[in-house]
Amino acid sequence: MSSKLRLGVAGPVGSGKTALVEALCRRLRDDLQLAVVTNDIYTQEDAQFLTRAGALDPERIRGVETGGCPHTAIREDCSINRAAVAELEAQFPELDLVLVESGGDNLAASFSPELVDLCIYVIDVAAGDKIPRKGGPGITRSDLLVINKIDLAPQVGADLALMEQDTRRMRGDRPWCFTNLHSGEGLEQVLAFLSQQLPNS
């Protein structure tokens, strides 16, 4: 692993990837040197959102337009993302953490080990309590699974106890957590996971 940590954030459209990246930037930017690469198919929407939200200085945020399958841009041919990361690392050699947010994708999405050191996979309760048991690399092999939007469970009829049971069965000893990123609930668990992974932490 390099002296800086490259962290991938993946998950389906609308699961809360950008919300997680924003929350991590806000909590960590005073203590760590950060940069972000976002992926969108035809726009730079997520990069623009993070800039407007003031998550980081604009020069530390790069938006990548993949122009096609978001999975390909982080796995099979991640050269456009590698170039964006390399550009940020050259501009800011003191970086501690580079966050790479994938475009919204399905449960089969996974990052190339050439691009990131670790991956957080984000799903949301609103997609249904069956999602953890459907499996896929994001569910079973990500370094941390984040189950977001737990506040919506009553509205969508999702059973959090069942999601917990299925998650434990599918992931074994791999870490996971419930979050409500809108309120910040569960964010401390994500931060604790990261603090264990950062070099020199």
Curated annotation (Swiss-Prot):
- Which GO terms of the cellular component aspect does the record hold? cytoplasm
Q: Which InterPro entries match?
A: CobW/HypB/UreG_nucleotide-bd, P-loop_NTPase, UreG
Q: Which GO terms describe its biological process?
A: urea catabolic process
Q: Which Pfam families match?
A: cobW
Location, primary (coarse class): cytoplasm
A GO molecular function assigned to this protein is: GTP binding
Transmembrane stretches, start-end: none
Location(s) in or outside the cell: Cytoplasm
Which Gene3D superfamilies does the annotation name? P-loop containing nucleotide triphosphate hydrolases
- Supply the alphabetized keyword list: Chaperone, Cytoplasm, GTP-binding, Nickel insertion, Nucleotide-binding
Indicate which residues the UniProt annotation says bind GTP: 11-18
| Assembly, per entry | Homodimer. UreD, UreF and UreG form a complex that acts as a GTP-hydrolysis-dependent molecular chaperone, activating the urease apoprotein by helping to assemble the nickel containing metallocenter of UreC. The UreE protein probably delivers the nickel.
Q: Which family does it belong to?
A: Belongs to the SIMIBI class G3E GTPase family. UreG subfamily.
What is its biological role? Answer: Facilitates the functional incorporation of the urease nickel metallocenter. This process requires GTP hydrolysis, probably effectuated by UreG.
Q: Which NCBIfam families match?
A: ureG
**The protein's name:** Urease accessory protein UreG
Its source organism is: Synechococcus sp. (strain CC9605)
